[in-house]
């Protein structure tokens, strides 16, 4: 494959691609296994699909997991890689257990309680807490028990519209959520009750995705308004503040954002079919950022998700409405 985008410092090389068959060829979301060698995806069918490399290094489909009555919108691996969660439009979240040494999966639990579509699911850094959010405007926080059962610890209502994304802080028991009400909220357990401790405003429309940096002191958000906003935790005042913004770099909504824990590079995927990379402007200006590479026509239609590999530097995966799952390498000259 020779598809490479270049600039003075970076190349973006397409390593491999896999295609879903029509009519179920809109790939919504993907998640890397913590070992960096397995991908889980979900599309406009009822399946969670597992992808891995064969003995020749070629990526391919190895398993399809069927446990939902409607499309699965988001997938998430537990930090240990043993469990996989899928959030579905059938208002449930499925939990799958991976066998120790094989790519075999067992359906171990189904989390029910939301009254409408579950839009997102996320594990905390310990793998014991799970958060789900829904079109019903609620966030449920679940605790995993020893027998693979889950107990609902809290049901939180604070957003005025559908909740699109939930994301745990990488080092603390702190949950972030974003919504169609144009806000980001932070939730924390205070004396046994999960409460909203901070609300961020700045977006002009629905906020589609969130990502923390490795240390958890910065957050990026993207949305329907084509904005990428950078937030920083102000320790002195104990609140999150907006420190930087990109506007009009995309011609259509930005659906996905991810912050690499290995390189500190940020990547976005947009409905304008592009993938854009950002990094810190300089060590002297830690709160300013710049675009380092823009890949136009990364997919033939909307780019729905972009995720950095957690183990291998500068490797990322993307998926889109064109039915393709692509593996890329951001090469530093």
Curated annotation (Swiss-Prot):
Top-level taxon of the source organism: Eukaryota
GO biological process: iron-sulfur cluster assembly; protein maturation
The entry's keywords: Repeat, WD repeat
InterPro entries: CIAO1/Cia1 (IPR028608), G-protein_beta_WD-40_rep (IPR020472), WD40/YVTN_repeat-like_dom_sf (IPR015943), WD40_repeat_CS (IPR019775), WD40_repeat_dom_sf (IPR036322), WD40_rpt (IPR001680)
WD repeats: 22-61, 67-106, 113-152, 158-197, 202-241, 249-288, 298-333
Gene3D superfamilies: YVTN repeat-like/Quinoprotein amine dehydrogenase
Transmembrane segments: none
Gene Ontology cellular-component annotations: cytosolic [4Fe-4S] assembly targeting complex
SMART domains: WD40 (SM00320)
Similarity comment text for this entry: Belongs to the WD repeat CIA1 family.
Function description: Essential component of the cytosolic iron-sulfur (Fe/S) protein assembly machinery. Required for the maturation of extramitochondrial Fe/S proteins.
Name of the featured protein: Probable cytosolic iron-sulfur protein assembly protein CIAO1 homolog
Originating gene: ciao1
